[in-house]
Amino acid sequence: MVDLTPVIETMEHRWMRAWVNGDMRGLKAITAKNFILLTGSKPPVILDRASWIEGAAKRYLASSYRFADIYARGFGGIAIFSATLELKATMDGRDWSGLLFVTDVWRKRRIGGWKLVQRVVSKPDDTPHLAKAIKSLQLWKA
């Protein structure tokens, strides 16, 4: 089985750099036509591709980013990427910087290669006991 982690990480950085650099053409090139961005807010909100790209170009402006705690997994022509994302950004001139958790779904096309089809964005839960409690359910020891 091929490890898709380096391929998908590269695509993630291409996508984020396009946003940071205001390269909407580059962003469009690797964003699927049926892309959605789903926020883990209350209530959840969905943006389609056109809304996301318009917002990223004019209102929600990123200036830098850093991924950490990266997890990637491939399933043939589908790949999942999850990571914490430290983002410096503004929305309508107001600071929107912070730590996020993103889960992205990538699909490989015969023509055009890998395209981002979905991004789910939420705030990480830093409740101290949560990670420990979930980890205690693991049947293996890491």
Annotated model-derived regions:
Residues M1-I30, I36-A142:
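A beta-strand edge to alpha-helix "cap/lid" segment located at domain peripheries
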